[in-house]
Amino acid sequence: MDIHQILKLLPHRYPFLLVDRVNELERGKRILAIKNVTINEPFFTGHFPARPVMPGVLILEALAQAAGLLSFDMMGEAPGDDKVFYFVGIDGARFKRPVEPGDQLILDVELDRIKGGIYKFKGVARVGDSVACEAEIMCTMRTVA
């Protein structure tokens, strides 16, 4: 899935779109996506000027956006002004290595279960073979007026 397809499925835009490409998608099960991290990211201006590191919360957001792509694809729907996929919870977040400019963040997200309208995912973000972050992510679809 290229960036044009991603833009149809995610409502996020610059500077908050954190998925550049989907390399694998197993409908309703798993997604493998990437975020190319460059020195031009706006957050590097202040985090940290002498030693730029991608904020952990943005790594989690990238995993959540990949989960959103998996969910919208599974439902065969695109977001609209009346439907939003909200990030509602996180468990067991662990950060194992810094993510720096020039890294390619590999986002590996699996659907664990759906219960009571809450989608639970297991996500791992890697740089090469090294785990940068892992977490369980919860999201839900809401219709808004």
Curated annotation (Swiss-Prot):
GO molecular function, one term: (3R)-hydroxyacyl-[acyl-carrier-protein] dehydratase activity
Keywords: Cytoplasm, Lipid A biosynthesis, Lipid biosynthesis, Lipid metabolism, Lyase
Entry's EC annotation: 4.2.1.59
First-tier enzyme category under EC: lyase
Compartments where found: Cytoplasm
Cellular component terms (Gene Ontology): cytoplasm; membrane
Principal subcellular localisation of the protein: cytoplasm
Record-linked HAMAP family: FabZ
NCBIfam families with a match to the protein in the record: fabZ (TIGR01750), PRK00006.1 (NF000582)
Official protein name in the record: 3-hydroxyacyl-[acyl-carrier-protein] dehydratase FabZ
Organism of this sequence: Acidovorax sp. (strain JS42)
The gene coding this protein: fabZ
